[in-house]
Amino acid sequence: MGVYHGNDLKKPTGGKKRPHQKVKRKYWMGRYPTFTRLDNRDVRVHIRVRGGNYKIRLKRAAYANVIDPETNTARKVRILRVVETPANPHYARANIIVKGTIIETELGKAVVTSRPGQDGVINAVLIEKRSERPAG
């Protein structure tokens, strides 16, 4: 379902504006946000957007491409949990992954650099390596 992103007839003060004489244009329409959630498998959806292009939306995520800045190598690793989301504290509680989210992976903590709802993939940069516990 589309979401109207045009101007409504309310002023910031709460008063009403005069009704505009234009009809609603198709290019004023939008969509609801994707809210990529942590899951045990990846789920991607291909949607057609304006101009006949396609976007890949990541609905559910289990893996991330994590780059280690020390060795400059990338690995596909499992996401263990969502630690913190600076964009919205409620997102971390609901396991929603957006750009800037700090995630716990098999390698350690990483910050998400891609937009999963737009790109269809989670790319992240390692910020804190996981400490190896000695056996015994």
From Swiss-Prot:
GO terms for molecular function: structural constituent of ribosome. Residues 13-23 have a biased composition (Basic residues). InterPro entries: Ribosomal_eS8, Ribosomal_protein_eS8_arc, Ribosomal_Se8/biogenesis_NSA2. The keyword Transport does not apply. Belongs to the eukaryotic ribosomal protein eS8 family. This is Small ribosomal subunit protein eS8. It comes from Hyperthermus butylicus (strain DSM 5456 / JCM 9403 / PLM1-5). The gene is rps8e. GO terms for cellular component: ribonucleoprotein complex; ribosome. GO terms for biological process: translation. Keywords: Ribonucleoprotein, Ribosomal protein. Gene3D superfamilies: 2.40.10.310. Disulfide bonds: none annotated. Part of the 30S ribosomal subunit. Residues 1-23 are annotated as: Disordered.
